């Protein structure tokens, strides 16, 4: 999707106050909802993703699972509000050996586990709004050896940015 796009600075893939914030995202909703609301704390439009289980209500990008984002920027930045419920996000990267690796961070896990194709890790959210900066290059290097990145899937949101 962004493979032939000049990538420098920030590349926004989700912006809740845009006219179509989920245009390139697929939505899965079962026993929950995905809707745009005005947040009382910041008095701005936000995307609320809420469900009874993190595996039944979520968004994924790109919408077509056969496509890839083709983004080479090393950082994933998200602004997330702590709703005091289970939260997780997942991102998949393609390393320099052409191996897809997934990283999953969640606020309900207590230990880090590194397996050949997935690394799961705990994440703590402060009360209110949190800025999550995920250094994909560093996490990939520390978990799987030195790698260069291009990532195809995954993510969760007021604003989601990728930056170099």
From Swiss-Prot:
Keywords: Cell projection, Cilium, Cytoplasm, Cytoskeleton, Flagellum, Microtubule, Nucleus. This is Cilia- and flagella-associated protein 20. GO terms for biological process: cilium assembly; flagellated sperm motility; positive regulation of cell motility; positive regulation of feeding behavior; protein polyglutamylation; regulation of cilium beat frequency involved in ciliary motility. The keyword Ligase does not apply. Belongs to the CFAP20 family. It comes from the Eukaryota. Its main location: nucleus.
């Amino acid at each position: 999707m962004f493979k032939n796009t000049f990538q420098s600075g920030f590349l926004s893939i989700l912006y809740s106050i845009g006219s179509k914030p989920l245009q390139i995202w697929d939505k899965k909703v079962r026993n929950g909802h995905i809707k745009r609301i005005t947040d009382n704390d910041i008095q701005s439009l936000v995307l609320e993703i809420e469900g009874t289980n993190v595996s039944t209500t979520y968004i994924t990008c790109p919408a077509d699972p056969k496509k890839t984002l083709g983004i080479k920027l090393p950082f994933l930045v998200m602004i997330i509000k702590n709703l005091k419920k289970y939260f997780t996000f997942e991102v998949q990267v393609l390393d320099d050996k052409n191996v897809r690796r997934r990283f999953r961070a969640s606020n309900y896990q207590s230990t880090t586990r590194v397996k050949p194709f997935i690394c799961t890790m705990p994440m703590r959210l402060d009360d209110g709004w949190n800025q999550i900066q995920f250094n994909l290059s560093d996490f990939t290097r520390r978990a799987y050896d030195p790698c260069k990145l291009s990532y195809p899937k995954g993510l969760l949101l007021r604003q989601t940015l990728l930056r170099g």
